[in-house]
Regions:
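PRPP-dependent phosphoribosyltransferase catalytic core
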Residues: 5-6, 132-175
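Active-site-facing substrate-recognition patch
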Residues: 1-49
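Gly/Ser/Thr-rich loops at beta-strand to alpha-helix junctions
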Residues: 56-61, 127
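Short, glycine/charge-rich flexible loops or terminal/linker lids adjacent to PRPP-binding catalytic cores
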Residues: 72-118
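Acidic, divalent-metal-coordinating active-site segment for phosphoryl/phosphodiester hydrolysis
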Residues: 122-131
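Short Gly/Thr/Asp-enriched flexible loops that form oxyanion-binding sites at enzyme active sites
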Residues: 62-71, 134-135
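Conserved acidic residues
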Residues: 50, 116, 146
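Short glycine-rich phosphate-binding loop at a beta-alpha junction
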Residues: 49-56
Length: 175
């Protein structure tokens, strides 16, 4: 499927919620569409990535699939608000999400992606704050970032910047 056909199929199936977010569950439920999206996001990163890094929770679904497609490891990043790392030493990064709420990502200090080439994968970029937090976290662990791959993004200056620099692979961009 061409990128244009993929974008059209995606636009036909996506439903925007009342909060402005896209409901991606129908995409994940369509095996052909999901497979085509995973292939599109992985394209160009073959042999260039040791780990795919993705945030909890929906990013994990997509990130694990892209990692499998690339033959790479998967390094999940937890949202610390979920309280998983209660008794571990962690590296934390704090950011403001698209709703202007204070959030934090964290990984154990012995994170498996340390020093490895990584591809950042998420489902959708609203403001770029989550991706910027992932970048900051990866930089703390000396992980060379090979790129960013997402199903979709809202049109913002940071998105344009990443696209112009060739850092972002995105199936769909919305106004």
């Amino acid at each position: 499927m061409t990128d244009l056909e993929l974008k059209q199929k995606l636009q036909d199936i996506l439903v925007q919620g009342e909060d402005g977010r896209q409901d991606l569950l129908p995409v994940y439920a369509d095996p052909e569409l999901f497979s085509d999206i995973v292939a599109a996001l992985a394209r160009g990163y073959e042999g260039k990535v040791d780990y795919v890094v993705a945030p909890e929770a929906m990013g994990w679904v997509l990130g694990a699939a892209v990692a499998t497609r690339l033959g790479a490891g998967f390094a999940g990043v937890r949202k610390l608000e979920n309280g998983v790392y209660l008794n571990e030493d962690i590296c934390r990064v704090i950011f403001m999400d698209h709703e202007k709420k204070r959030r934090s990502f964290g990984v154990p200090l012995n994170w498996n992606a340390k020093g490895k080439r990584v591809l950042l994968v998420d489902d959708w970029i609203k403001t770029g704050s989550q991706v910027q937090a992932l970048i900051s976290l990866c930089e703390r662990f000396d992980c060379p970032i090979q790129g960013i791959a997402v199903i979709g993004a809202d049109r913002r200056d940071i998105i344009r910047e990443w696209l112009e620099k060739g850092q972002l692979r995105c199936v769909d961009i919305r106004e």
